[in-house]
């Protein structure tokens, strides 16, 4: 939202009134989540929940990792107008360059999080039929959707719409066709 406001208004003064401090703190927070496995040169983010709240405590949620990169890049872009400490700048450059950003597989589909494609691939209706109570929560450790590819909201579709210049139309269409039938379209309000 900050970058949309600045790009629309040209009001860079907002950076001196707390906005730059806010986005720097967001970048530091995301940086604090990064881990690097011994056998990898890439940073990963583990144990998160993306917009799809049916799958909790996942690793490398594509949406979360891409948003972290966006925050790193935003701080670096704004550093032209708002000077950064060299150590922080180098840390954010390293984070942006080396964070794991999921790529499309051979079918053009981006995996929502590590292990998503290994989950049971069933329809939303099949999962709905497993409910004991119609008001039962689908997610969490014991939810009926937790071990399936059925999702509450399509993280990948949201990510692609936010960063559409990074992907081809074909990749966007392929992912929409893959994820839409697996999306339950539950309320974006938690639980």
PLM regions: where:
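The feature captures the catalytic groove of carbohydrate-active enzymes
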Residues: 1-17, 28-97
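Active-site core of glycosidic bond-cleaving carbohydrate-active enzymes
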Residues: 4-8, 17, 73, 77-80, ...
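Structured mid-domain segments that build the active-site/substrate or prosthetic-cofactor binding neighborhood
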Residues: 23, 28-33, 152, 172-176
């Amino acid at each position: 939202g900050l970058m949309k406001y600045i790009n629309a208004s040209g009001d860079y003064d907002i950076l001196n009134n707390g906005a730059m401090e806010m986005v720097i703190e967001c970048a530091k927070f995301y940086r604090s989540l990064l881990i690097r496995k011994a056998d990898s040169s890439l940073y990963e983010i583990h144990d998160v929940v993306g917009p799809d709240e049916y799958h909790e405590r996942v690793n490398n949620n594509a949406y979360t990792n891409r948003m972290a990169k966006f925050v790193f890049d935003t701080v670096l872009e704004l550093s032209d107008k708002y000077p950064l400490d060299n150590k922080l700048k180098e840390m954010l450059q390293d984070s942006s360059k080396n964070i794991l950003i999921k790529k499309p597989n051979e079918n053009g589909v981006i995996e929502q999080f590590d292990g998503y494609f290994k989950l049971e691939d069933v329809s939303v209706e099949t999962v709905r039929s497993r409910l004991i109570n119609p008001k039962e929560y689908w997610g969490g450790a014991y939810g009926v959707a937790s071990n399936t590819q059925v999702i509450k909201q399509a993280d990948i579709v949201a990510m692609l719409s936010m960063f559409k210049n990074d992907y081809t139309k074909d990749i966007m269409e392929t992912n929409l066709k893959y994820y839409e039938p697996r999306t339950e379209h539950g309320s974006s309000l938690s639980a």
